[in-house]
């Protein structure tokens, strides 16, 4: 009984929203009836359909009979030229490796802030090599931006 009232209340809200000129369902959306008078909204995403019911991520689409993805036609990734120096420009000692234990909750004593401080103490050049090492050894662009700001603030304020 309570569920029926919730469903009916949902219809009243939807009808009121349509009457007020609010956002209407777009064409790929459709409402299907459930047994007992309820309904649910079903969205169709043409790019996400998989004919066999499974999605395959990280693989290229290859047509049957095509030579595009045949084994042996592409060189292995390890044999491709790297396009850059094989050794890092600013190698870090083991105690200065980027942290792996961040909880991502925005702590005031974040391990990444401590990492930026250790880089500044190690290089002691006003932050230039610390910023370069940061660019080279930290993969996440958001963390890089945060740490860049921390290093720049630390060098401006003098510690």
Swiss-Prot record:
Name by which UniProt lists this protein? Oxidoreductase-like domain-containing protein 1
| Comp. bias (Basic and acidic residues) | 52-63
Record-annotated Oxidoreductase-like domain positions: 91-120
Database matches in InterPro entries: Oxidoreductase-like_N (IPR019180), OXLD1 (IPR039251)
Q: Which gene encodes it?
A: OXLD1
Q: Which GO terms describe its cellular component?
A: mitochondrion
Where do the segments described as Disordered lie?
Answer: 36-91
What is the annotated signal peptide range for this record?
none
